[in-house]
């Protein structure tokens, strides 16, 4: 959800002059997303959006020069294929083993996907603990991980 919302924000600011957070929130709501001003503010910060001149005494949001549309799922697919060595589970916990030094990057991508069943991740150097709620959703999350690993 978060990833799709942020991608939509990047598309909106590229195609429509948006000057305020309130205006951006209205545009997102018009497209069926339920957002608050606080959510929009966090998205703007995470995306690193800047204000650029848009005429005399007018400014609009823009992506920093050289920024592409984000695709954490694609990045996660590459990281999974290159880094994950083993996946195991018990109850509502999934343990992911990775090559040394890559667990934080994989966990960060997992967090950015905003899967509702994943309530959190904890990463060490080569191990990630994924906490799933409810525990019945573990099979679904494991299937997603398998699909990621297959690329």
Swiss-Prot record:
Pathway: Amino-acid biosynthesis; L-arginine biosynthesis [regulation]. The keyword DNA-binding applies. Pfam families: Arg_repressor, Arg_repressor_C. The keyword Transcription regulation applies. GO terms for molecular function: arginine binding; DNA binding; DNA-binding transcription factor activity. Keywords: Amino-acid biosynthesis, Arginine biosynthesis, Cytoplasm, DNA-binding, Repressor, Transcription, Transcription regulation. GO terms for cellular component: cytoplasm. GO terms for biological process: L-arginine biosynthetic process; protein complex oligomerization; regulation of arginine biosynthetic process. It is found in: Cytoplasm. Regulates arginine biosynthesis genes. PANTHER family: ARGININE REPRESSOR. This is Arginine repressor.
